[in-house]
Amino acid sequence: MASPPRHGPPGPASGDGPNLNNNNNNNNHSVRKCGYLRKQKHGHKRFFVLRGPGAGGDEATAGGGSAPQPPRLEYYESEKKWRSKAGAPKRVIALDCCLNINKRADAKHKYLIALYTKDEYFAVAAENEQEQEGWYRALTDLVSEGRAAAGDAPPAAAPAASCSASLPGALGGSAGAAGAEDSYGLVAPATAAYREVWQVNLKPKGLGQSKNLTGVYRLCLSARTIGFVKLNCEQPSVTLQLMNIRRCGHSDSFFFIEVGRSAVTGPGELWMQADDSVVAQNIHETILEAMKALKELFEFRPRSKSQSSGSSATHPISVPGARRHHHLVNLPPSQTGLVRRSRTDSLAATPPAAKCSSCRVRTASEGDGGAAAGAAAAGARPVSVAGSPLSPGPVRAPLSRSHTLSGGCGGRGSKVALLPAGGALQHSRSMSMPVAHSPPAATSPGSLSSSSGHGSGSYPPPPGPHPPLPHPLHHGPGQRPSSGSASASGSPSDPGFMSLDEYGSSPGDLRAFCSHRSNTPESIAETPPARDGGGGGEFYGYMTMDRPLSHCGRSYRRVSGDAAQDLDRGLRKRTYSLTTPARQRPVPQPSSASLDEYTLMRATFSGSAGRLCPSCPASSPKVAYHPYPEDYGDIEIGSHRSSSSNLGADDGYMPMTPGAALAGSGSGSCRSDDYMPMSPASVSAPKQILQPRAAAAAAAAVPSAGPAGPAPTSAAGRTFPASGGGYKASSPAESSPEDSGYMRMWCGSKLSMEHADGKLLPNGDYLNVSPSDAVTTGTPPDFFSAALHPGGEPLRGVPGCCYSSLPRSYKAPYTCGGDSDQYVLMSSPVGRILEEERLEPQATPGPSQAASAFGAGPTQPPHPVVPSPVRPSGGRPEGFLGQRGRAVRPTRLSLEGLPSLPSMHEYPLPPEPKSPGEYINIDFGEPGARLSPPAPPLLASAASSSSLLSASSPASSLGSGTPGTSSDSRQRSPLSDYMNLDFSSPKSPKPGAPSGHPVGSLDGLLSPEASSPYPPLPPRPSASPSSSLQPPPPPPAPGELYRLPPASAVATAQGPGAASSLSSDTGDNGDYTEMAFGVAATPPQPIAAPPKPEAARVASPTSGVKRLSLMEQVSGVEAFLQASQPPDPHRGAKVIRADPQGGRRRHSSETFSSTTTVTPVSPSFAHNPKRHNSASVENVSLRKSSEGGVGVGPGGGDEPPTSPRQLQPAPPLAPQGRPWTPGQPGGLVGCPGSGGSPMRRETSAGFQNGLNYIAIDVREEPGLPPQPQPPPPPLPQPGDKSSWGRTRSLGGLISAVGVGSTGGGCGGPGPGALPPANTYASIDFLSHHLKEATIVKE
């Protein structure tokens, strides 16, 4: 406002002598005070005249009259000139344009009175404090009178609440009541009264430079903010919340403020220069005092719970504790930006009719309106922010901080009378104290508050007439007071910007019972829950962040379609702590001003219908709630499909509690489980994990298949849906394979649990991180899939822990069903799985036939129980593999994935991050069966790399396809970082075994010609009576690498039905290290060990470590035996170390030890000198040894043969067993009752290195006599060791299955002989005779 024009020439002097201290004897009736004061800058005395509003004073009269003049301060050169009216005043300062009037002091003057206008700063110095006070009081009184005369504020507001003057027009037309705090706001008008104002010069340093805040500004301090008002500007350029100030200080004449990240400017410092050091110190002290006062105010009530904001300029704040107030009209966040709701303790204010329905009155406490003591009239209750009405009570009244009474909006403009609360109450904030539940209060029609205060979207009144409020504090039973909030705060710099209840609730909001809601967000558990009456299964007022109770395991759903359009707007919403009446809520009206700016985040689900695990009510401190639709759009976040409010909606939350399995109730009710339980420990028994696949072909194979099969139940008793969301269940027992929006994380694109309709993953938005399937069907490996009932009902088992995190993402060239299988499955590249190869070409026998064929005998239950690590292979319908050409179980090693050590169940540890090379494939194959060279899988030659990939490997994401088909020619990603150990024994099959049951050497079991990707080895002379018709070629030198023949030769040499095109692409083998251990008919040779004296080998720092030696006399399967040894605490897994010699390729990270010997590593932590952190398996060594009476053949010397063919077959000696001794840790996992010690990470040598371990379970089959192995039949018959082939490599779950018909060495033939699987893979090396395993004790 411009200064008034200078007056005309003064009239003649009155002749009265000057009266410096009593100036009012002047004839000028408008003069309030006059006297001599000094100017600040130079100290010159001038005669000052303070005039009130009038017609221009005597000067105007003398000049013939003029327009009315505002209050002003004039000064003349002397009193004589003023009295003589000899000239115009030297200067006139209009008081109505002053930002503030303050008492000041500087280095020169102790008693200053400073006037700050928008364009200048003017200060005068009094002689003493009394004179200063007199002038200051006169100035401030005049300002207050002018404000009252202008009608800008009620006269009662005139006295200043602090030392700052209440200036006219402070509220710019607000109807609020007063005090200096009326004007506290994020964006305060220039006419607002500030507590303190200083003129400072912002320096181009820190934020001043980055935010272009330089030059002369007014530093304006209010109760909660400081603003920088540039000269000639009406509004502050920057307003900082006092709560955002990290620290402040002054040095000399400089004052600086450091603000945090929540400030509008961002973090940084603002440096400003005051007139002198005294002013700088005064600024510092004053701001510190204001900050302390604010801190003390909010210490009474935690910041995180203060939830309200006075609505804009319409709500005066009469409590000094208020954080801030908004002074702009309510703008949507799209215009004002995301700003945090302010916390205000405003008494009552009513939004003017002009604000219409988009303004909402907010109370200081959201959902917590306590009645002030003075307001506790009969039934009178202050309204809480979201309208949670609370019964007033003496207990709550003293603590009440909700003094804003929500008045009518929407043009009704019914003003709410100010609540005459005591001063103490005005400063108090309501704590969360128990209050009696009372009926909802009526809201003035049309204003429901968004608890954020960012936008004032409000619901219009429900249709129909709305009677006026009979009393400002009285509300009808059907309505609930709403809180209107101003969304003018333009920045998230509001103090308490990160309060907890910003994001949905105060800490105790939701702690009510199911179907109950605490009316007060701040009352923890003491507040009686309000029964939600007509919510239709919705709980109003608070969003439950808990997972809904679900009966069908379908816990969470996506946003319902009707709310999809509001999603984008909902994203702007920062806080979801919405509160609405528990009874009725006004009908939403999309046309309300800022309703479209928000979406209603609804968590609707009825009762426990959305409960994920009805039997686990204690999974969260919070239980079921009902949604609180407020002024947001309609995002349904938790509506169960069976929910009465929104069916088919999907809540976007996932259960994070371990062990909460999705209860399966069919695919119809649980179709879109988008999220997965993340608990690795909720693992079913291994039999659940190892369920055989249930495919359409298998279902067709068994005529008795019926749709009425029982739902699968895990060992834990959980049932699993046949369909579910797309996130994978990290725990083997939990998942819903039905894809709904996200790509499946387990191995095939089409899960077996999905129905035979072949529904593939609909979208490729997320990459399938599971091993890609080897077959086009895309069904996951067996241990992921469901088992098939003999009746043909595919068990809808839940996929187990799939290998979703391999060391590197190998882009498989072949994607199953369109899935982008980006991770390689560590499948055995050396051949098909034993059982699959035998059974694949075979017709599906009856359940009993399958059981007997697997050696389980009639004792095998018809229901194919999921195999435990040593389950008999009976009970698996052979048609599974025969018709689908798939491996039974992936031959992979996922050291982190599937818990498979039965005795490790008590020690589930989270998987460590993988490093390349942590997957080791150990293939115990007999060259006499199908491997052209004794150890073909050695990837020494790039040309042989593709041949090594077993097409039958079920989960080979390397691109292997169905065996016998051209899909085998797919290129595969390089098998880098992996190590393949092939224990190929040239030993011939043992005579005496029925031709239909090839038992004995692994390769005989693993390599029927029809299915083997490798051609049978050429016959070689063998003096052994047990030599096969097709003797294998001479074994290689131990540790010597073999190169496969060209793929064409391999394919040509293969028998009928073999894979016709093993891809001959010489893909990069990367760092895949193959260790072939060709065990000749001679005594065992050291694996991958150069000639070294036995003493040198044994004499290592790891003395006392037991070495597991594979003897040549036994076939690969029989090489490992299990005896009933007592537990050995030091029996830890041994890291397999690849020998760098022989052309083996090692990963650059030296995943495997570079030692030239397979040095055993002591399980003691002190004895692991050669351990590498990335090693995953500990030393398993084939030792050359003549112990046990084993004869030494030509190749049995210390010096390994120089050529793979150099070894001549030696007559195998009679197997001589070496009894296990208690100190011999041959098997890490003992059978139940066999005294095997559990493998523990604590006892493992690599425990401190974060290694994953493999338990090598050496099992004994004393009842099974050696049986000769006939030539591989076209249709191999299952044998005793039939299922061992699936575990010949350290696959993802290496559990040796298939015990002889006469009883297993561990647990008997029945399934589930071992305890449930746990987090570590176990290798069960079953063997017939204990004598055939040699354990060298150092």
From Swiss-Prot:
Residues 16-144 form the PH domain. InterPro entries: IRS, IRS_PTB, PH-like_dom_sf, PH_domain. The modification Omega-N-methylarginine is found at residue 412. It holds the Pfam family PH. A motif (YXXM motif 6) lies at residues 823-826. Transmembrane segments: none annotated. GO terms for cellular component: cytoplasm; cytosol; plasma membrane. Residues 194-298 form the IRS-type PTB domain. Residues 1-12, 459-471, 859-870, 1013-1022, 1083-1093, 1263-1277 have a biased composition (Pro residues). SUPFAM superfamilies: PH domain-like. A motif (YXXM motif 5) lies at residues 742-745. This is Insulin receptor substrate 2. It comes from Homo sapiens (Human).
